[in-house]
């Protein structure tokens, strides 16, 4: 199907980017990797602008589920929204099981916590990181399809703000915690909607980042994040 093709293309693209842009930075600082990630995202966005142009294109929805009306029409859940929520829950459960109960998942956790120790234990660090990028790219493709299906439009800059908010949700919920990322995204979405409804349409996004700053000041590890223990 078309979705499988999109997913495969994004997976391969993610692995190529990892090999070209991130593998040379294995021993670099986290800040260097973050700056590289921002640079790569802008590079891909501008390449898409050159190839496809800035004009929005229609994106047909693949969801055939009818909308559901609740509370006498005060709340309407579209089919795309229902599928997105269900997909997020399923992906969270699968990823949690994968990282907790499979050999490769445990290897990913080991590499993320202590790369040098993981390598000494016989874990293939490069292969593990490449697999992580492949899984992340595949999930990004699924998220992109769900996003474009919801708004029925597609353009090179469509994923800019959602990408920033996704990173914000991960930090909000706790880096390294899969349920935390889902919880962070849910809470940020509620804050944004309530802010736009009761405060100001223009300040909706600003409120999201303001709440993030407050949470990080109070609990730097995020809502479900665990503090790192320094070994002496």
Question: Model-flagged regions — what are they?
Answer:
Residues 21-22, 43, 117-118, 171, ...:
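Hydrophobic/aromatic residues within transmembrane alpha-helices
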């Amino acid at each position: 199907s078309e979705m499988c093709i999109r997913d495969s293309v994004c997976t391969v693209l993610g692995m190529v980017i990892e090999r070209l842009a991130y593998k040379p930075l294995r021993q670099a600082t986290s800040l260097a990797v973050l700056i590289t990630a921002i640079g790569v995202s802008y590079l891909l966005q501008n390449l898409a602008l050159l190839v496809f142009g800035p004009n929005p294109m229609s994106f047909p929805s693949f969801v055939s589920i009818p909308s559901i009306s609740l509370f006498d029409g005060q709340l309407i859940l579209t089919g795309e929204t229902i599928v997105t929520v269900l997909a997020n829950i399923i992906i969270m459960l699968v990823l949690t099981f994968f990282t907790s109960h499979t050999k490769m998942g445990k290897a990913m956790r080991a590499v993320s916590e202590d790369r040098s120790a993981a390598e000494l234990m016989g874990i293939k660090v490069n292969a593990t990181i490449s697999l992580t990028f492949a899984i992340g790219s595949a999930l990004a493709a699924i998220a992109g399809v769900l996003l474009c299906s919801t708004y029925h439009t597609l353009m090179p800059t469509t994923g800019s703000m959602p990408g920033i908010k996704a990173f914000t949700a991960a930090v909000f919920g706790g880096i390294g915690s899969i349920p935390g990322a889902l919880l962070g995204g849910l809470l940020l979405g509620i804050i944004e909607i309530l802010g736009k409804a009761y405060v100001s349409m223009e300040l909706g996004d600003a409120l999201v980042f303001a709440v993030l700053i407050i949470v990080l000041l109070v609990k730097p590890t995020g809502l479900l994040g665990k503090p790192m223990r320094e070994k002496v």
